[in-house]
From Swiss-Prot:
Lineage of producing organism: Bacteria, Pseudomonadati, Pseudomonadota, Gammaproteobacteria, Pseudomonadales
UniProt family annotation: Belongs to the thymidylate synthase family. Bacterial-type ThyA subfamily.
Native source species: Pseudomonas putida (strain ATCC 47054 / DSM 6125 / CFBP 8728 / NCIMB 11950 / KT2440)
Protein name as it appears in the record: Thymidylate synthase
Primary location recorded for the protein, binned into one broad class: cytoplasm
InterPro entries per the UniProt record, alphabetical: Thymidate_synth/dCMP_Mease, Thymidate_synth/dCMP_Mease_dom, Thymidate_synth/dCMP_Mease_sf, Thymidylate_synthase
GO cellular component terms given for this protein: cytosol
Pfam family membership, one: Thymidylat_synt
Pathway the protein acts in: Pyrimidine metabolism; dTTP biosynthesis
UniProt function note: Catalyzes the reductive methylation of 2'-deoxyuridine-5'-monophosphate (dUMP) to 2'-deoxythymidine-5'-monophosphate (dTMP) while utilizing 5,10-methylenetetrahydrofolate (mTHF) as the methyl donor and reductant in the reaction, yielding dihydrofolate (DHF) as a by-product. This enzymatic reaction provides an intracellular de novo source of dTMP, an essential precursor for DNA biosynthesis.
Catalytic activity: dUMP + (6R)-5,10-methylene-5,6,7,8-tetrahydrofolate = 7,8-dihydrofolate + dTMP
Keyword field: Cytoplasm, Methyltransferase, Nucleotide biosynthesis, Transferase
Compartment(s) of residence: Cytoplasm
Active site: 192 (nucleophile)
Amino acid sequence: MKQYLDLVRDVIDNGTLQGNRTGIRTISLPGAMLRFDLQKGFPAITTRKLAFKSAIGEMVGFLRGVKNAGEFRELGCKVWDQNANENAQWLANPFRQGHDDLGEIYGVQWRQWPGYKRIPLSNPAAIEMAEQAGFRRIAQDEEDGVAFVILYKAIDQVRQCLDTIANDPGSRRILFHGWNCAQLDEMALPPCHLLYQFHPNVETREISLTLYIRSNDLGLGTPFNLTEGAALLSLFGRLTGYTPRWFTYFIGDAHVYENHLDMLNEQLKREPLEAPKLVISDRVPAFAETGKYEPEWLEKIEPSDFWLEGYEHHAPMTAPMAV
C-alpha cells in the first residue's frame, strides 16, 4: 500500500490546516486518486493492523439497509456508535428516533431510495408507465389549476446495478449513490463514500469499480473505505461471473486530522508489506462455476464469508474518531 503512504505524505506536505464542524483541525488537500489492480492483491494497509472484520461488517450492514448502530454492532462493527449517540447535532435532530438510530444513511439510500413522480392527471400514459415500473399512487392534488398525482417507489439501486451487469454489461450507467439532497437532514452523517460506478468488460470478463468519496479521513476512513470498495467489487464479480480488476478511488477532500499526525507519521516510517489476497467463502455461489444468477446473496452475505489470506502487518495503532 505504498500508494496510500504516498498520499498521506502528499497531504501532510502540501495540504492546508483548516477548521471544520468537528472542532478538530485537519490538514486538507483537494483532489486525490488511488488506483489498484485487484489481480495483484487486496488493498489492505500493512503499516498497521487493518480492522478488516469491522469494515466488512459495515459493508454487510449497508447491503442490508441497516440504519441502527446496534445492528452494526451485531455485525462486528462499532464505528457508528458515536455518530448515533454522541453527535450533538444529531442528538438535537427531531428526525432521530431514539438510542442507536442513524436515520436514512448509506444503506437505506442504496437499497430503498425513496423515488417520487409528480405527473399531471392529463397524462394518463405517463401514469400508466410509472405504475408498470412499480410506482404506486399515494396522493393527488392541484396547483395553479393543474391536477396531478404523486406516485412512490422504493428503488433498490444496488440490485439494479447487479441486474444490469448480468443483463446489459455494455451499459455505462451502472452506478448507485447515497447523496439524497431531500434527506440529508435525516441522517446522522451524510455519505462520504457516495458514488459507486461499475465497469464490466465482456471481452476480458473483468469488472472494475470507480468510487468517488467527497470527504476522506486518511487516518481512519481511507483504510476502511478501500476495504469495503474492493470487497464489494469482488462480491459483484463473484455473483455475475466477472474477475475483479481495477479499483479506482477518487477523493474530493483528502485530509488528515491533527490528532492523527503521530499515528500517521509513525506509519510513514514503516515499510509496507506484501498485499494479501481476499477470499470469499465457498458458501457464496460463484456464477462462473454455477451459471446461475443469484442476486439474493446481496442480503444473505455474512461478515464471516470474507477473510484475508497471507495478511502480514506491523504493530496495531489507534487514533480517536472525530464526530
